[in-house]
Amino acid sequence: MLESPSLTDQPTMWKRLLGGPTCGPVVISLAALFAITLTLDPADCRPGLPEGPGITLDETFNVQMGVFLVDLAPREYGWEIVNPFNLMDAFEAAYNPDHPPLGRLWLGVFHRIVQSIAPPAGLDDAPFVTVSARFGSAVAFALTSLAIGVFTGRRYGTVAGNAAALSLVLMPRLFGHAHLAALETVTNLVWTVTVLAAASLWTRGTRPSDRAAVLVGILLGAALLTKMQAILLPPLIGLWALWHWRGRAIRPLAIFVSVGCLVFVAGWPWLWLDFPGHLIDYFSRTTQRSMLHVWYLGSSLVDRDVPWHYPIVLFVSTLPMLILAAGILGAVSETQTKSDSDAAHTNDYGRLGSPVRTLILGSVLAPLVLFSLPGVTVYDGVRLFLIAFPGWAILAGIGFANIYRRLTAKSRLAAIILTLVFVAQSAGLFLYHPHWLSFYGVHVGGLRGAEAMGLQTTYWSDSFSRSFLAEIVRVAPKGSTVEITPVMHPSQWTELHRQSPLLQRHEIRVQAYADPVAPTGDFLAVFHRQADAPSRRMLLSRGWVPVSEYRTRGVTLASLWKQRDDAGQRDDAGSTKDTKRHETK
């Protein structure tokens, strides 16, 4: 009779788990998940934990639709949801089709899990709870870091894999997005897995196999079901495959695109109700929506008129300096592979022109090129091209490993110092907590330098964090009315109040700052989105006096104002001497 080998007879398995390219990324990803989970609270929903970013503009839309997809529609219709009449009833009345369903479904699943296990305090009557869905983004971010680390480690060595996973975690903009119930982090996960699957499965022979084309096509469909940015994947992978395999790539590309489109259509029931009409409606939204304004180089610009260099400048300026430098090195230098056998591989991972390296670099460049094209709308900092950052983390891991190997050959101490300096970039995560979406690298002078350059310092109302709301409660008498500006959509202020136990306990009413000439509120809360927020001079001229300012790295991101009275006299500089200024720690 055959006996199963004991664990001691399988050193290879344990070596792979504990000492191979998997262990480091697992530890890094779990540490990131733990840190993010501790810092999700926007408004005193988890009073015993550190604060997280404030409720951002789009989160409540995503959570509401996620809860609809996971809880409301299945509860009302069950399996009868597949009935065409029920589909029409469910997906025409309450459903918001501004984005495909998969990302919101992901958030809805984790909303259900958290609400079942550990519902937050003070929001028992809310139809959905944003902070609970935020955990879904935290998990997606950890999985993205893990995928990047394992992929890089298996091809370029353990050091490169660990550095790649860590590079992603140490990007404050991505770390901040991982705290939000938004679609960007889930999109990053599906985009990254699709690119890495193509790089892994399509480079194993003389041409991509049909099976590999089907598998990556399924992932393409999942990406298309998450967010519009996935439309970049077919041209990216198509050009890459044709460049390396010429005519041999035509068949797998046809399979890849066909499967992706089938999965996309099959996974979105809303399309079934009026396929051509709804498909056109979805893809035309980017050109038919209302215009937004962007603050760039000291000017307020319409999103369609932003200069071509905006994505490049924002991408470069929002990366930590050493990760930027390591990524450049990883993009332009030859590198060693994991082992001699890998170096003999037909695709030679370490060579600059190898299929793997070119696809990773292409995944970075494609979003930047798209949003640099004339007439393509771009706004909200790096949010729309956040998919460019995971590929850069891989390049940074490769670049760091190159330097590390050279230093190790000369001086072990120098390699250790390099590692410590690289890890020290985590300082950005602490210094910008909880306003990670306002991070700028030291190579542009940090946030203060970016403000001096005329770059946008905040844009998504995350600066209305727990500390700022607590200041409102401290200053405003019970039952006061606080007006909010700028107002980017009608439900912004109602959802801020609904998701805030702090404001509800103090019976603070919240409303839009709709009439600057005749304000009806007692106080005014401003998040400093420069392109849309009223200027300080205008507020002073309307009779408002600053009460508190919330700053990060010396730059005001949110402020609280009240109507002028005898207790708040302006000095010649146009400010009040009793204004409190709070610096986030």
Q: What is each PLM-predicted segment?
A:
Residues M1-A43, L143-L146, G153, I250-L262, ...:
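Start-transfer (signal-anchor) and selected internal transmembrane alpha helices
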Residues T194-A213:
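Membrane-interface transmembrane helices that cradle and orient dolichyl/undecaprenyl
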Residues V131, F135-Y156, V193, A197, ...:
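Transmembrane-helix motifs of polytopic, lipid-linked glycan transferases
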Residues L57, A133-A140, N162-L170, L174-V193, ...:
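Multi-pass, polyprenyl lipid-linked donor-dependent membrane glycosyltransferases
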Residues G20-E59, V67, P74-E76, N86-D89, ...:
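Transmembrane signal-anchor helices characteristic of membrane glycosylation enzymes that use polyprenol
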Residues N62-R75, H99, L105, A222, ...:
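Transmembrane-lumen/periplasm boundary regions of multi-pass, lipid-linked membrane glycan transferases
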Residues C23, I28-L30, I117-D124, L146-L170, ...:
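Transmembrane-helix signature of polytopic, membrane-embedded enzymes
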Residues L38-G52, G103, P269-L273, H278-T286, ...:
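Catalytic lumenal/periplasmic loop and adjoining terminal transmembrane helix
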